Amino acid sequence: EFQKVFTTGKSSANRNFIVYVLPKENQPHFRIGISVGKKVGNAVKRNDVKRKIRASIFELREEIQPDLDFIVIARPSVSTLTSQEVYSNLKHVLKLAKVMK
C-alpha cells in the first residue's frame, strides 16, 4: 500500500519534508507512513526525528482529513530542527498538500 501512495498519490514539498497523499474512500481515520533516510543521521537521530514527526501529527490530528493515506519523508535538513520547528514545517507542507480541513 505504501507503493500505491508513492506511485498514484500527489506530492507536495518544502525544504524539510515531502508528503505523498492518496485519498481513500470510506476510511474512518487517516493513515500515515513516516520515512527518515540514513542521510538524516545515525539511528538515534533518525528515531528522534520520527518521534518529533509523530508528536506533531498527534497535535494536528483533529485538523487532518480522515479519508487519506499519506507518507511523510524527512529530508536531511530536519535533523537540526527543534520540535516546534518540525511542527510548523510539517503543518506548512500538509497545508500545501491540502490535507488539513
Where does each model-flagged region fall?
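Positively charged, solvent-exposed patches that mediate nucleic-acid binding
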Residues: 1-101
